[in-house]
Amino acid sequence: MNGTEGPNFYIPMSNKTGVVRSPFDYPQYYLAEPWKYSVLAAYMFLLILLGLPINFMTLYVTIQHKKLRTPLNYILLNLGVCNHFMVLCGFTITMYTSLHGYFVFGQTGCYFEGFFATLGGEIALWSLVVLAIERYIVVCKPMSNFRFGENHAMMGVAFTWIMALACAVPPLFGWSRYIPEGMQCSCGVDYYTLKPEVNNESFVIYMFVVHFLIPLIIISFCYGRLVCTVKEAAAQQQESATTQKAEKEVTRMVIIMVIFFLICWVPYAYVAFYIFTHQGSEFGPIFMTVPAFFAKSSAIYNPVIYIMLNKQFRNCMITTLCCGKNPFGDDDASSAATSKTEATSVSTSQVSPA
């Protein structure tokens, strides 16, 4: 056994020398030098410094401009809300515990931080699934007469919360548990032990299949079909410069979405799955800390990718920041056209990214 398992924690270090202590009571500087904990705290402070204003601006601009309250933007707004959960209820706690070198808020605080971090991440993930399905239905038209309306958007938002709660709530009630991970200053689902008392093995399998693999398959399928549909439309309308431009824009958008999704979650999921399938193997605290903390950056680039690349939202944001005037003079009509994706044929208004 290359780790030390306690009643409510797992330290990735053998206790042969007797130095291992509970991460709820003592600094964990035997796992890593104090300066490394300071780096984590500084990193979390940077995420808070960037995440709060970006996500606040997302919510504020949407509230200020009625034309942004479209069905599609409800899902984008949901991303902003869940990112706030991650920043306010997760990042602030992690920054504070990193400064102290251990999880100073005890087991209750660990469950609190782990729950909200998981909830925020899962809401974001399932929001991306709903976005992918919406893009697929509107652009590829598997149902010819279907129009994505406000009721569908609200159902999509409710769906993201239901699925997120289905992942984040069970550890609170005895199906798995939240424990400190990596350098022991942030909490997550227990991938480190089988812990039969809380049926940990079945929960981890359920989480990987239902809350990671299935969303990834859905997103890949929807955006793959979207790219094919756009290419077919461009081939049929070769003289249309606007369609060709729209094809490039949506292809770029899809590539950015897929790449950043993979960059954000695959390293964390891979490391967690490796640890779970290699119980008792030797690994250092940094092995889990780096991907876990990097995944938290999704609260920053999610709004950048899914909202800042939305031309209509971007124009409204500039107008808000510039006290009601847009110095760049972008035409709202063109912005509005990009959001009307329910037209009867695949055209610029359908394949634009917003």
UniProtKB/Swiss-Prot annotation:
The processes (GO biological process) annotated in the record are: absorption of visible light; G protein-coupled opsin signaling pathway; visual perception
Recorded topology in the membrane: Multi-pass membrane protein
Motif span ('Ionic lock' involved in activated form stabilization)?
Answer: 134-136
TM region(s), chain numbering: 37-61, 74-96, 111-133, 153-173, 203-224, 253-274, 287-308
Q: What is this protein called?
A: Rhodopsin
Q: Which residues lie on this side of the membrane: Extracellular?
A: 1-36, 97-110, 174-202, 275-286
As for subcellular location, the record says:
Membrane; Cell projection, Cilium, Photoreceptor outer segment
Which positions are glycosylated? N2, N15
Gene behind this protein: RHO
Give the family this protein belongs to, as stated in its UniProt record: Belongs to the G-protein coupled receptor 1 family. Opsin subfamily.
Task: Supply the source organism for this entry.
Answer: Lithobates pipiens (Northern leopard frog)
Which organs or tissues contain this protein?
Detected in retina rod photoreceptor cell outer segments (at protein level). Detected in retina.
